[in-house]
């Protein structure tokens, strides 16, 4: 008996079937790739949270020895590892930032109120000249009357009846806008906005005043 060479089980895909498969893959990629990019950006935000907690611990340790806080990173021993995507603002006091744009960093001749992001590692175009975060969405709470002035408040002369407020600014997604964080030695609350979430913020807890990952291009 003659057997047909055209066994239905051996037939290939038709052009329409291939086009459907390609379309499905394209749809899945359109959904998955942006989510993956956002996941990567959120993982970069962990640097800011980790280093701000280290800054908080450094201030508390310094206070336990000196009965005061400090406006300067080098005085409290706050020095994030190289390769930092975020810059850090300890205070708004006079002085130059530690600019990380070279392999070797000069020994500071005075107090260092801020530390830049590592533009030597990420390139000159990544440099953040001023790592001062937006602070409008963080509201101090309690009867002590603390505010959002970066540094020791009211002044160092008021210590030990003093407190501190600090922050960070970076670029988590390599786009034009910044990702901003703050940390305080006092209680506060976050206010809902285009780029921020509402909620109580405990002392020593980093708060994302402008979430660059969640709202590219939106005004704060």
Curated annotation (Swiss-Prot):
Proregion span(s): 1-12
Subcellular location: Fimbrium; Membrane
Primary residence: other
Membrane topology according to the record: Single-pass membrane protein
Effect upon mutating residue 193 to D: Pilus-minus S phenotype
InterPro entries: N_methyl_site (IPR012902), Pilin-like (IPR045584), Pilin_PilA (IPR028188), T4P/T2SS_Core (IPR050470), Type_IV_major_pilin (IPR053672)
Note: Pilin assembly limits pilus production and S motility. This limitation could be linked to the high frequency of reversal of gliding direction observed in M.xanthus. Reversal implies loss of pili at the leading pole of the cell and commissioning of new pili assembly at the other pole.
Protein's UniProt name: Type IV major pilin protein PilA
Lineage: Bacteria, Pseudomonadati, Myxococcota, Myxococcia, Myxococcales
Gene coding for it: pilA
